[in-house]
From Swiss-Prot:
Gene3D superfamilies from the UniProt entry: 3.30.70.1730, 6.10.250.2350
Keywords attached to this entry: Ribonucleoprotein, Ribosomal protein, RNA-binding, rRNA-binding
SUPFAM superfamilies (UniProt xref): Ribosomal protein L10-like
Key word Secreted present: no
Summary of the function given for this chain in its UniProt record: Forms part of the ribosomal stalk, playing a central role in the interaction of the ribosome with GTP-bound translation factors.
Similarity-based family: Belongs to the universal ribosomal protein uL10 family.
InterPro entries, A to Z: Ribosomal_uL10 (IPR001790), Ribosomal_uL10-like_sf (IPR043141), Ribosomal_uL10_bac (IPR022973), Ribosomal_uL10_bac_type (IPR047865), Ribosomal_uL10_CS_bac (IPR002363)
PROSITE patterns recorded: RIBOSOMAL_L10
GO annotation, cellular component aspect: large ribosomal subunit
GO MF, any single term: large ribosomal subunit rRNA binding
GO terms classed as biological process: translation
Name of this protein: Large ribosomal subunit protein uL10
One Pfam family here: Ribosomal_L10
Length: 166
């Protein structure tokens, strides 16, 4: 079924806005995935702050033109499902990676982050990025560990001086 020119322009504009706002993008082939599974993926994507859309390749190429995601143009072949992470760079990669575990036919093609192309085997790097809250928690544990070590060292010095004075 042919799409009207106005509809094509609207799709390109919508995807372009998502691309401009996106921190990272992941491209996948969802051939053979059931409608129920795709609905579940879209629901999880909304909750994770990820924009997910199936778009024709020619429209997708126009939509990402001039953005940091135009490095993905070569993988826009066949049915293309694209996801843009809006809140955390690893959200879309993590979402697709988890979804692919339960779907044999779901294939992650590639990703882009900060204008760099990531092949399908490099998705784990993007998916393993800690979220903002996880990063803060890691930083706080490092700071807490350092301060407790300092407190123990100062207590040991105090005990040594008290023992030497006695």
């Amino acid at each position: 079924m042919a799409i009207k020119l106005e509809d094509k322009k609207a799709i390109v504009a919508e995807v372009n806005e998502a691309a401009k706002a996106g921190l990272s993008a992941v491209v996948a082939d969802a051939r053979g995935v059931t409608v129920g599974a795709m609905t579940g993926l879209r629901k999880e994507a909304r909750e994770a702050g990820v924009y997910v859309k199936v778009v024709r390749n020619t429209l997708l190429k126009r939509a990402v033109e001039g953005t940091q995601f135009d490095v993905l143009n070569d993988v826009f072949k066949g049915p293309t499902l694209i996801a843009f992470s809006n809140e955390h760079p690893g959200a879309a990669a993590r979402l697709f990676k988890e979804f692919a575990k339960g779907q044999d036919k779901f294939e992650i093609k590639a990703a882009a982050f900060e204008g760099k192309y990531l092949a399908a085997n490099q998705i784990d790097v993007l998916a393993s990025l800690p979220t903002r809250d996880e990063g803060i928690a890691q930083l706080m544990s490092v700071i807490q560990g350092a301060t407790s070590k300092l407190a123990r060292t100062l207590a040991a010095i105090r005990d040594q001086k008290e023992a030497a004075a006695a």
